[in-house]
């Protein structure tokens, strides 16, 4: 190799007896190599010279001494780290800043570990257990009561009410009648079997009936119009000699004047006002 062949490719200075760098079969003095080829450090913005270690992550470069956690500033050299929003964080800082806390043990749920979510809270998989049997619930069905979560078998064993009709567990809601509880969809009219949830109803011998069935089967009938006398919503009725009338139906059988609060006479089965009953063969 001649002396000219041992010169810096860029500045042509002789490299005899000097340090140099060989790149792509070309020789460079240290000064030229650093100026032309050095990467710039993400942290300090200075060139990473040939005598320094260049640490690279996703086409970004750092001096070894600048490769630190963005929050606690501890070195990340040969340590696990996480990149978030262009920042490098050690696992401890990432966990404190970005990870969820377990609702049960209050410890950090580490990135990459499995976590369970329920009603906006998070648990370690091993902390998300049935309040009674302490077995992991995982993705199985569960029922919440007060501050605890229960697997279905434990909840049914400890707390559940059973429907008076179908004898199955009532997990939520329900209707109570005569100290018994029903599913909403099981509380039916004893006559026509329609659902009574959010409906007015009457009872007979401890059996519930919708108003139509109760009136048809059990309500007294008006002696005038023959329609049921329900007594609902404060309705008034008149009773005389085992007969009943709606107050608006208690009228003179001849002139139809109201007899409510008035004296009246009877003729056979007919009710008459005093005027119409005068001179007739009547009973007082």
UniProtKB/Swiss-Prot annotation:
InterPro entries: FHL5_LIM2, LIM_FHL1/2/3/5_N, Znf_LIM. One of its GO terms (molecular function) is transcription coactivator activity. SUPFAM superfamilies: Glucocorticoid receptor-like (DNA-binding domain). One of its GO terms (biological process) is positive regulation of transcription by RNA polymerase II. GO terms for cellular component: nucleus; Z disc. The keyword rRNA processing does not apply. The keyword ATP-binding does not apply. Keywords: LIM domain, Metal-binding, Nucleus, Repeat, Zinc, Zinc-finger. Pfam families: LIM, LIM_FHL2-3_N. A zinc finger (C4-type) spans 8-32. Its main location: nucleus. May be involved in the regulation of spermatogenesis. Stimulates CREM transcriptional activity in a phosphorylation-independent manner. This is Four and a half LIM domains protein 5. The lineage of its organism: Eukaryota, Metazoa, Chordata, Craniata, Vertebrata. The gene is Fhl5.
């Amino acid at each position: 190799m001649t002396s000219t062949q041992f010169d810096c490719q860029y500045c042509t200075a002789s490299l005899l007896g000097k340090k140099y760098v060989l790149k792509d079969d070309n020789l460079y003095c240290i000064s030229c190599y650093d100026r032309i080829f050095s990467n710039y450090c993400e942290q300090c913005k200075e060139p990473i010279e040939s005598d320094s270690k260049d640490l690279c992550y996703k086409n970004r470069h750092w001096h070894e001494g600048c490769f630190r956690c963005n929050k606690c500033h501890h070195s990340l050299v040969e340590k696990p780290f996480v990149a978030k929003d262009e920042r490098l964080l050690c696992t401890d800082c990432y966990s404190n800043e970005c990870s969820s806390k377990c609702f049960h043990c209050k410890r950090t749920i580490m990135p990459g570990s499995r976590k369970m979510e329920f009603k906006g809270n998070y648990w370690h998989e091993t902390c998300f257990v049935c309040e009674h049997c302490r077995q992991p619930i995982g993705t199985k069905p569960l029922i919440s009561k007060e501050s605890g979560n229960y697997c279905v078998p434990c909840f049914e064993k400890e707390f559940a009410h059973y429907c008076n009709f179908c004898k199955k567990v009532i997990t939520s809601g329900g209707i109570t009648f005569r100290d018994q509880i029903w599913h909403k969809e099981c509380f039916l009219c004893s006559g026509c079997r329609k659902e009574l949830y959010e409906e007015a109803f009457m009872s007979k011998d401890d059996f519930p009936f919708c108003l139509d069935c109760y009136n048809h089967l059990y309500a007294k009938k008006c002696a005038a119009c023959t329609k049921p006398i329900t007594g609902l919503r404060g309705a008034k009725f008149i009773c005389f000699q085992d007969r009943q009338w709606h107050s608006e139906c208690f009228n003179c059988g001849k002139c139809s004047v109201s007899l409510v609060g008035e004296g009246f006479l009877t003729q056979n089965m007919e009710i008459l006002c005093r005027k119409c009953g005068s001179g007739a063969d009547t009973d007082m």
